Every structure is written in structure tokens, then in C-alpha cells.
Design a protein with these regions (language model features):
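Structural stabilizers in ordered domains
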Residues: 1-203
Length: 203
């Protein structure tokens, strides 16, 4: 049993077919950021790994009202928030969402329809699998990837470890993962409880 593309589509609502997500590794990142976000990062806003610090996006795109009414600025703002979602949630690295991979910047350079044609679901699943493999190294203490996908998948596939949920009455067009938006209180650090429950499932 493992996470599949069907799970990604059902839980997150991301497309799992379309244009393959392949990022460039040789770009003028200052120019690429200027074209996509409308601002050029300062020297300190690049991580030593070459990735862009999320603080760059926070500095320029925190409040929608600062850009409302300016069509070009609204496009920059929206693309910045797509980048934030990718860098801190869907394709997060082990920095805990502090950095955004520059190789993804050119993928946001087209129109929104073009951006929507990428197979983001496939990229998210591939990225998560890679991080799950890497974290098996005993020297690693952190993990990148879409943790919320992994967590909701585990709750769905192993109901005994899931928090209590009210009856599900989905809104038209919403994906399955939305039903977990109502979860307010659960104990995430009960390691002993989860181990005992999983041991019981395996018997």
C-alpha cells in the first residue's frame, strides 16, 4: 500500500496529467524573478544553495490591498502566492518552507491557464517519495515534501489513527481532503499511542 496519483488528485485536487514539471538549472535567476514577480531579489535573498528565500516574497507580497486595482501587480501577487504555496506546502524542502526552488520560477512565467496545465500532482508525489527515501538515513532529522498529503493519506487508509470527524457533506467541486479542514483538536505527538495502534493493525 502506498500513495498513488489517484490519492493526490482526490486529496489535494491537483492535476495528475498534463505537461511534465521540469525545472531549469541554468537561468539568470535575477531576470527570471523580475519577469515573474516584478521585483529583483537582493543578494541576501538567495540561500547558499541557490534557492530563493521565501522572505523575498513576503517582503513584497503580504497584503492584496497594496496591489488591488493594478492589473499587472495583481498578476505578480497571484504568482507570488502560487510560489509560496509550492515552496512552503506542496514542494517544500527540508528547510521547512523557508526557501523556494529557483528552478520552478520559469514555470510560472506563462499565463495562468498555462501554469494550470502542468502535472503538479505528479511533481508533488515524486518530490514526496524522494524525501521519504532520503529520510530513511539515520543521520537525517528532517524531511521535505508535502506532509499534509502524507498525513491525510494515513488518516484515510488507517482510520484507527485518524481524529474524529463530523459527517461529511462536501460542497460541489471540492476535493476529498477538504473534509479534514474541520479538524481542530488532536494530539499529534502521542507516539506511544500511534505505535500501539499500528502494531495492532499489523497483527
Amino acid at each position: 500500500m502506498t500513495i498513488t496519483l489517484q490519492d493526490v488528485a482526490g486529496i489535494l485536487g491537483l492535476p495528475t496529467d498534463g505537461t511534465v514539471v521540469i525545472g531549469s538549472t541554468s537561468e539568470d535567476w535575477h531576470a527570471a524573478c523580475a519577469a515573474v514577480f516584478g521585483h529583483v531579489p537582493e543578494a541576501g535573498e538567495f540561500h547558499h544553495s541557490g534557492d530563493l528565500r521565501i522572505s523575498f516574497l513576503d517582503r513584497h507580497y503580504t497584503r492584496w490591498t497594496d496591489h488591488e486595482g493594478n492589473h499587472a501587480a495583481e498578476i505578480y501577487f497571484t504568482k507570488a502566492h502560487i510560489a509560496l504555496m509550492l515552496g512552503t506546502w506542496l514542494l517544500a524542502d527540508k528547510s521547512g518552507g523557508s526557501n523556494f526552488g529557483c528552478r520552478l520560477v520559469p514555470l510560472l512565467g506563462g499565463g495562468f491557464e498555462e501554469i494550470g496545465r502542468f502535472s503538479w500532482g505528479s511533481a508533488v508525489l515524486t518530490h514526496l517519495f524522494r524525501n521519504l527515501c532520503e529520510v530513511t538515513d539515520a543521520r537525517r532529522s528532517d524531511m521535505g515534501g508535502c506532509h499534509i498529503l502524507l498525513q491525510i493519506w494515513a488518516w484515510i487508509r488507517f482510520p484507527p489513527i485518524a481524529p474524529p470527524l463530523p459527517p461529511h457533506h462536501p460542497e460541489p467541486g471540492t476535493h476529498y481532503g477538504c473534509r479534514f479542514n474541520v479538524v481542530q483538536k488532536f494530539k499529534p505527538h502521542e507516539v506511544t499511542h500511534y505505535r500501539a495502534t499500528l502494531d495492532t493493525l499489523c497483527r
